[in-house]
């Protein structure tokens, strides 16, 4: 029997209709896995051994009663076969420390999804630079003059921090916007923090597409997150609405080009963000949208994921 641990935000606070981690847990349980629940505070290293204060978990597809937890037991992570790291950003130093603990468990024989080193290496915004042939024109800098020159040249840009999530602190700055200066100061903390500027992509009105890639293979359907009226962010967390749709030719091209590199890096479950035919982000920490896509189309994303996990476990 496969023993699966998950590190996530409090399970008591999730929306099971939309939560991808919950979809994964339900699928694993249906396959007969034993589930163990952890939050970040439950991870520890004791004399070089990665430990988890883990609780046996049962999940139910019931909006009033969706989980039951057993008694916590301090256990070496090496007693598990696989750990899903599903903690949401912020990708802060605490998150980085957690990846080191999980890397220790990996060295002790546990499959970690996604690979801890690659979680550190692949910043969700910056990692797109490795695939710049697919991105809008982009700069990453903390230099206000460089941002101003980029804005001058493009006229309509998006400015965002490198560590945001769910559309937080994303600004659209048009030509002659009087707020450019204060937005630059805020995002760069007066020149002390890197920020990203991208040429605005008008196709955002048709949605910011989330394309899921499982062990290098694109899922054939995406979730287009359509911004609400008067908004430039499609993120569901920012009030956007989701419409599932088949991948376009350009979506396939992007996902197939990036997939092999993701697989090579041990990034087994990844969400690409695409606007029009441009790649804007590569989400590796805890990508979502499984529930919405599986509800709209006959596609078994969690099945793809656990097939990939079992292949890697040699099952």
UniProtKB/Swiss-Prot annotation:
- Give its E.C. classification number: 6.3.2.3
Residues binding Mg(2+), per UniProt: 281, 283
Q: Give the protein's cofactors.
A: Mg(2+); Mn(2+)
Transmembrane helix listed as a keyword: no
**Cofactor stoichiometry and binding remark:** Binds 1 Mg(2+) or Mn(2+) ion per subunit.
- Give a yes or no for keyword Glycoprotein in this entry: no
- Alphabetized InterPro entries for the sequence: ATP-grasp, ATP_grasp_subdomain_1, Glut_synth_pro, GSHS_ATP-bd, GSHS_N, PreATP-grasp_dom_sf
Q: Name one GO cellular component term.
A: cytoplasm
This entry's Gene Ontology molecular function terms read: ATP binding; glutathione synthase activity; metal ion binding
Q: Which NCBIfam families match?
A: glut_syn, PRK05246.1
In its UniProt entry, what is this protein called?
Answer: Glutathione synthetase
- Which species expresses this protein natively? Shewanella oneidensis (strain ATCC 700550 / JCM 31522 / CIP 106686 / LMG 19005 / NCIMB 14063 / MR-1)
Whichever gene encodes this chain, its name is gshB
């Amino acid at each position: 029997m496969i023993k699966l641990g998950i590190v996530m935000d409090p399970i008591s606070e999730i929306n099971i209709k939309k939560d991808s981690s919950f979809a994964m847990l339900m699928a694993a349980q249906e396959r007969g896995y034993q589930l163990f629940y952890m939050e970040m505070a439950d991870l520890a290293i004791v004399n070089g051994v990665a430990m988890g204060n883990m609780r046996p978990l049962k999940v139910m597809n019931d909006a009033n009663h969706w989980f039951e937890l057993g008694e916590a037991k301090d256990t070496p992570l090496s007693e598990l076969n696989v750990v899903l790291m599903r903690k949401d950003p912020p990708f802060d130093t605490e998150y980085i420390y957690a990846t080191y603990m999980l890397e220790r468990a990996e060295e002790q024989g546990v499959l970690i999804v996604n690979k801890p080193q690659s979680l550190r290496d692949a910043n969700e915004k910056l990692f797109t630079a490795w695939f710049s042939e697919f991105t809008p024109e982009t700069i990453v800098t903390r230099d206000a003059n460089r941002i101003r020159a980029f804005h001058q040249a493009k006229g309509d840009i998006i400015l965002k921090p490198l560590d945001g999530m769910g559309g937080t602190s994303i600004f659209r700055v048009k030509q002659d916007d009087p707020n450019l200066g204060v937005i630059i100061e805020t995002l760069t903390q007066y020149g002390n923090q890197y920020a990203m500027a991208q040429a605005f992509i008008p196709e955002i009105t048709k949605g910011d597409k989330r394309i899921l890639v499982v062990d290098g293979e694109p899922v054939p359907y995406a979730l287009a997150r359509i911004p609400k009226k008067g908004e430039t962010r499609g993120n569901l967390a920012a009030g956007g609405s989701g419409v599932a749709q088949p991948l376009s030719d350009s979506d396939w091209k992007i996902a197939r080009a990036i997939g092999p590199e993701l697989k090579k890096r041990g990034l087994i479950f990844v969400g690409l963000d695409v606007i029009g035919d441009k790649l804007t982000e590569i989400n590796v920490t805890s990508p979502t949208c499984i529930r919405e896509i599986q509800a709209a189309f006959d596609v078994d994303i969690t099945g793809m994921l656990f097939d990939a996990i079992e292949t890697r476990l040699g099952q």
